[in-house]
Amino acid sequence: MAVCIAVIAKENYPLYIRSTPTESELKFHYMVHTSLDVVDEKISAMGKALVDQRELYLGLLYPTEDYKVYGYVTNSKVKFVMVVDSSNTALRDNEIRSMFRKLHNSYTDVMCNPFYNPGDRIQSRAFDTMVTSMMIQVC
């Protein structure tokens, strides 16, 4: 089950973070923040290959005892980070990839909104509803 979904700007500040157990919210914020170092490492290691292959999915960034952290980066260097419960062994890599594609499509809809200023926090009800449904769907 996805317990935290975050959208991080190109400059590494959060545009949107949603986590389900609210008592562990600070822990998830920390995990998302620390995963940005791994994202930057993977992007710099891939370099031109990332641009040439158009592979946006970064895969597993790092596992912890209770959670696994996955990453995805857009062409505009906006990063999506998803924290998944490690106990859910039925969740496959292609399912995570498809969740990131859904998230990317929804983020694109937010960006196309003429009333949204790029770089501001995402406060779209449609985006929030989609993230909530993704977190429930994976359970």
Curated annotation (Swiss-Prot):
The keyword Endoplasmic reticulum applies. It comes from the Eukaryota. InterPro entries: Longin-like_dom_sf, Sedlin, TRAPPC2L. Keywords: Cytoplasm, Endoplasmic reticulum, ER-Golgi transport, Golgi apparatus, Transport. One of its GO terms (biological process) is vesicle coating. It is found in: Cytoplasm, Perinuclear region; Endoplasmic reticulum; Golgi apparatus. Its main location: cytoplasm. One of its GO terms (cellular component) is cytosol. Component of the multisubunit TRAPP (transport protein particle) complex, which includes at least TRAPPC2, TRAPPC2L, TRAPPC3, TRAPPC3L, TRAPPC4, TRAPPC5, TRAPPC8, TRAPPC9, TRAPPC10, TRAPPC11 and TRAPPC12. Interacts with the heterodimer TRAPPC3-TRAPPC6A. Belongs to the TRAPP small subunits family. Sedlin subfamily. May play a role in vesicular transport from endoplasmic reticulum to Golgi. This is Trafficking protein particle complex subunit 2-like protein. It comes from Mus musculus (Mouse). The gene is Trappc2l.
